[in-house]
Amino acid sequence: MPGHSLAVQGLAVCSGIRVRLSDQCMKARLLALYLPQFHPIPENDLWWGKGFTEWTNVGKARRYFRNHYQPRVPADLGYYDLRVAETRQAQADMAREYGVEGFVYRHYWFGNGKRLLERPFNEVLASGEPDFPFALAWANESWRGFAHGITNRNMLIEQLY
């Protein structure tokens, strides 16, 4: 058709993964999203009650239909606490065993220097352990009360960017 063009890109299959045709096949890396909410922080104590972590919500899960096994009790590492260096090392060891090549840490930076849930990542940086590749994923959203099922829809902490 006049005035129209068709672009065709070559594709190759490298180890079962489709990639754009180039000088060499690119390899996709398997990374795991790392949620740092599995340790207590003062803000969560204030908003949700002393000792709140994401495990609190796991324990509240209910069975809604036949064969719906809830709440699920975590296997292998149990109800771990990310303040414990051995837990973080065990997670990296397990990830490596199953072919995961790195963690993508959720990074809660709200602006004006305010960060939350930063302790596990800070300890990894300070100690260099576990020796496991990583990246950061900025969780750029404000927190409101309804996120955990309460009727309070007030702003808990605002994202300023």
Language-model segments: which ranges?
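Glycan-processing catalytic domains of CAZymes
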Residues: L21-Y161
